[in-house]
């Protein structure tokens, strides 16, 4: 009976330690995301500039501009994404951008 109690206690401690480790990783990821949004707030790329395809369209200046990437750009090293004029739906999506004050009147 005591063996079962000890084994159960060890399992609880092990699970708890993994949970704490996951929470620390999540906190680090949240901190990095906050830094990314601060960078987006500070600067917006002009039309035609090279942008990061992994980030949101908020990095491009203007309500209708989006980060447009070529077909299969992730598999080609030389392929780069650029800020290009998008559709009207792009302006609707970009209403939630943190740096929209830069291009909105």
UniProtKB/Swiss-Prot annotation:
Keywords: Disulfide bond, Ion channel impairing toxin, Neurotoxin, Potassium channel impairing toxin, Secreted, Signal, Toxin, Voltage-gated potassium channel impairing toxin. This is U2-lycotoxin-Ls1d. Expressed by the venom gland. It comes from Lycosa singoriensis. One of its GO terms (molecular function) is toxin activity. Residues 1-17 form the signal peptide. Residues 18-41 form a propeptide. The keyword Secreted applies. GO terms for cellular component: extracellular region. Disulfide bonds join 51-67, 58-97, 60-83, 69-81.
